[in-house]
Amino acid sequence: MSHNDTIVAQATPPGRGGVGILRISGLKARDVAQAVLGKLPKPRYADYLPFNDVDGTPLDQGIALWFPGPNSFTGEDVLELQGHGGPVILDLLLKRILTLPGLRIARPGEFSERAFLNDKLDLAQAEAIADLIDASSEQAARSALNSLQGAFSARVNHLVEALTHLRIYVEAAIDFPDEEIDFLSDGKIEAQLNEVMADLDAVRAEARQGSLLREGMKVVIAGRPNAGKSSLLNALAGREAAIVTDIAGTTRDVLREHIHIDGMPLHIIDTAGLRDANDEVERIGIERAWQEIAQADRVLFMVDGTTTSAVDPAEIWPDFIERLPAKLPITVVRNKADVTGEALGISEVNGHSLIRLSARTGDGVEVLRNHLKQSMGFDTNMEGGFLARRRHLQALEEAANHLQQGKAQLLGAWAGELLAEELRLAQQALSEITGEFTSDDLLGRIFSSFCIGK
């Protein structure tokens, strides 16, 4: 589809509401104003007018806002019609607008895409619009707004600028090898490179925090039947999310709860008790449990404290530990401390965290909450922080790898040409975050996930 088309879409959620907004962007927006309103409203003033059908009869009446380009969200001529939020009224008005030549329904995210293409915002800011709409906590919303206002982009642009200056110095050292001063070995390039790498590490740390705020952490509760997994899910959720009985195998399917711990989103997943089951339904539930474990960020290995005194997971259930994905973090949770009389708290056993608690009474659950937050390195004090997506983390990691390789070339062989190439690739990776260097395919994937009216 052409970006020269004039597009229209509903900017408010579907369904009934007090107000419904249609947004039009493109060269034909002024034609829509003349046809539907009978005039072109004064720029950036709210004008209360009837919205007319083809024969001149009013379909609705409401507020019209006219934003001539380039001083608009998309950088194009933009008209907003704010009428009553009934779906029938909005549909009639939309059909009326589409009778005009040169107009079509907008694709998902096309308004934001046009704003990006017209340099009204960069790619990270465009993504922040969707993240702000989808924010699941106050802290996530504040961080998304910071990204929209350019906090993340400013950090990335600072790194790109520093790399540009460093590349200029390295290129000079390559182009003028006969100078008396050996630029590659005078220590200045290494010092500047170390400074850029330190700044990049700081941005990566903040980006990981931002990614946690946006994506959350997936925690799977796993263990044998009747270990108290569903009771723990209820304790963490603060409500009766799962049925709890003394009958082994009560939970036969995956149960999911979305909670927040001091602003960090957490996806808690309760699974069927793991055992050799004869029942077909239970077997399916157990297979699904293993599928969830394979995708988890952390596993809470639930142990009935009344059945064993062991604390090492490899001793408690070696077959379970052997089947877990390599490097998957495990927290051993010894449950039923109210029965065994074990001291509540957290300790370390052979590289694994061990927590003693009672899911039934809730004693020790707060220790587990703090452990989950700290195990992911989540910082509740993120004033001025920003949200980050997985593609941002990948780009930052790629840039860091290129800088590491460039430093190795500098110190190992004083190879200026190879260092210059690694610096270029690092700069290119960072530029993908803001969209300075981005493929059309990536743009399509990003904006297709947006709302229609955005």
Swiss-Prot record:
Keywords: Cytoplasm, GTP-binding, Hydrolase, Magnesium, Metal-binding, Nucleotide-binding, Potassium, tRNA processing. Signal peptide: none annotated. Pfam families: MMR_HSR1, MnmE_helical, TrmE_N. Its main location: cytoplasm. It is found in: Cytoplasm. Gene3D superfamilies: P-loop containing nucleotide triphosphate hydrolases, Probable tRNA modification gtpase trme, domain 1, tRNA modification GTPase MnmE domain 2. Mg(2+) binds at residues 230, 251. Residues 216-377 form the TrmE-type G domain. GO terms for biological process: tRNA methylation; tRNA wobble uridine modification. (6S)-5-formyl-5,6,7,8-tetrahydrofolate binds at residues 23, 80, 120, 454. K(+) binds at residues 226, 245, 247, 250. HAMAP family: GTPase_MnmE. Belongs to the TRAFAC class TrmE-Era-EngA-EngB-Septin-like GTPase superfamily. TrmE GTPase family. This is tRNA modification GTPase MnmE. It comes from Klebsiella pneumoniae subsp. pneumoniae (strain ATCC 700721 / MGH 78578). The gene is mnmE.
